[in-house]
Every structure is written in C-alpha cells, then in structure tokens.
Amino acid sequence: MSWSDKRRHWRARKSQVNWYLWSGIGFLSLVIGSFVFGGYLLHKFLNDASTLPIEAVAIKGERTYTTDKDIQIALQDLMQRSFFSADITLVQQALEALPWVYRASVRREWPAKLRVYLQEQQPAAHWNGTAWLNVHGEVFEAPSHPELEHLPHLSGPDDMGTEVLTAYAQVNSLLKINGFTLASLNLTPRHAWHATLGNGIVLDLGREDKMARIQRFITVYPLLAKQDKPIARVDLRYDTGLAVGWGDAQTREPIINDEKPR
C-alpha cells in the first residue's frame, strides 16, 4: 500500500471515530437533557399547590385553650404550598408559637393530609403577675383564662421557676395538713422567701430553713389567734422566735425574739 493510500485510510478511520464520538456525546447530552427536563417537570408538578393541594389537617391531642380558629390562622400561609413542598418544620414551628401549645408534631399522610398532634401547656401557677408557670417549672406567656384564677401566684427570677414551684409544693403541703392554704409564694432576687396565706397573713421566711420556720408559725399560731386583733404579717427570720405585725397599721411586736432577722 502506497503512502498516499495509507493517509486516505487513516483519515477515513479518523472521520469514522469522530462520528462515533460525537454521536455518543450527542446521545448522552440528549439523555441528560431529558432527565433534567423531566426532573424540572416533576419538581413543578410536586410543588404545584393546585395539582397536589393539602386538603385536610387532622388535629389530635387534648385541647382546652387552643381553638381551631387559632390553628387555622397560624397555618393559613403555609397551607398554600403543595402536599410535597409544605415545610413540615415550619408548620411545627408555627404551631408551637401559639401561646398555649407546648409541643407539636407534624407528619404527612398520603394522599393530601397533614396529621398534627398537639400537647398544650399545663399551667401550674401565675408567674410574676403577667405570665404562667407550667408543671415543669417553665415560664410561658399566654392570655388569662377565668377558670385558672384559682391557681397560686408565684414570683421570682425567671431562671428559678422550677425551684419556686418545688418550694410551693413543699410549703403548701405542710400548711394544708395544718388547716392553712398558701395563696402566693415569692422569691426575691436576694433569694429570700415570702409567703401569703389564704387568710391574707404574710410570712417572711428569709433565705434559710423555710420549712422549719413554717412549722414554727404553725406551732405559735394558736397563741397568736387568741389575741383580739388581726394578724397582718409574721416575720420568721430568726433562729428562735418571731415578730408579728398587727392589723392595718403593720406595727410589729416581737415574740420570743432574741436574734437578728436573716
């Protein structure tokens, strides 16, 4: 074979190889393009609220303070998304932002439903005059409810809610078995305790030995009750003894009082 024939043969094979190469590249591009376009159409379909709308929201869980209207308002914007594109995390956050909702769990349920389980706050006490304390000792903000007016009034630093709630349970238990009720309990920023009984008597308990001081009041109260004047305040911040404030004048009279208050 002459040199010129070899060159023609090589060019023909090179042209054939190039044709195969470009054909393969074109086919691969077509396949990739089809996948991309198909993915785009699928994405558009799944995110089209008119094609796959959320048709219902099923609410489970016992509710006392959270109404259907509250839930509807909280979710009205999020429900404009399709069944697949709705952000479950945002739905959960919107529900947990409702004042009386403690926790919310949300899941999709085919073909067009969201299933929601709500756990409401369980208020244990009024807190600092404007908020609530739940049964876990956590502070939360929510509107007042007439049926909760009977709850005790507790106050103190917000990070001490658990301690105040625990102290209330202890003090109230001791008072209750001795015929008293505890209406409010306050912990000051300096960690001093003040209790108000259901009959209006204020007990200054100080920072130490509050349970022993409550017991001292219970022991001495029959003696105080025999006095022909109303008791307004009892200062128990002493190692032994106490001081009594009588009536509206709040004049204090020491009884077996031999130590400085603390």
From Swiss-Prot:
Residues 1-20 are cytoplasmic. It comes from the Bacteria. The keyword Transmembrane helix applies. Keywords: Cell cycle, Cell division, Cell inner membrane, Cell membrane, Membrane, Transmembrane, Transmembrane helix. Belongs to the FtsQ/DivIB family. FtsQ subfamily. Essential cell division protein. May link together the upstream cell division proteins, which are predominantly cytoplasmic, with the downstream cell division proteins, which are predominantly periplasmic. May control correct divisome assembly. This is Cell division protein FtsQ. It comes from Shewanella oneidensis (strain ATCC 700550 / JCM 31522 / CIP 106686 / LMG 19005 / NCIMB 14063 / MR-1). The gene is ftsQ.
